[in-house]
Amino acid sequence: MKIAIGCDHGGFPAKAAVIEVLRRHGAEVEDLGCHDTNSVDYPDYARAVCERIVEGRADRGVLICTTGTGMAIAANRFSGIRAAVCDTPERARRGRSHNDVNVLVLAGACHPAGELAAITTAWLEGGFEGAEPGKERHARRIEQIERAGRRSEFALLGRTDPEIHAAIAAHIAQEDATINLIASENYVS
């Protein structure tokens, strides 16, 4: 499994310990920075990690900042990213099993290295239950979240290009209201 990791200056002191846990579990780790405690903008590192996942160059990601909040907000702006701040091993385990969390967000300043290791281990070892019989509700809920994200992106188009938005909305309404039959002829010689 390939995991991209990123942090800001507040998460930098915790990053080495988290990387060690990831590697101990057999993960190939790509460290996207930052590389010291000089002040940086956390959205840059959230973007770098999330782009790797969205583009298929990483399977999952880890983000670390002081509280985790800013990184989680930035990460969840990306379609297909399910980032969660996990502050206990149980929340990390449930985040994976119920929500298929693909980006673990850690509050580097709020936990000692041992706790961060336990949280990371629980997230790594957890699996998504959505395909298991009787637990399909988890996959259904993720699809609902993805649909809401697509609607949100479509709404944004309404503000940025109302003419295109109106044309697409009219087409969707027409498709919903009618059955379109496509005729084709096949000839056999």
Task: Identify the residue ranges that each predicted region occupies.
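A short beta-strand-loop structural module common to alpha/beta enzyme folds
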Residues: E28-S39
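Solvent-exposed alpha-helices and their adjacent loops that cap or buttress functional pockets
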Residues: I53-R57, R96-H98, I172-Q174
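Glycine-rich phosphate/diphosphate-binding loop of Rossmann-like nucleotide-binding domains
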Residues: M1-R24, V29
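Structural motif
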Residues: K2-I3, D59-L63, R82-A84, V101-V105, ...
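Short, structured coil segments at secondary-structure junctions
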Residues: H25, F78-S79, N99
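Helix-adjacent hinge/juxtasegments
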Residues: Y45-V85
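C-terminal binding/interaction regions
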Residues: K2-G6, G10-P13, T88-R151
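N-terminal glycine-rich, Lys/His-bearing helix-loop that initiates the first secondary-structure elements
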Residues: S152-S189
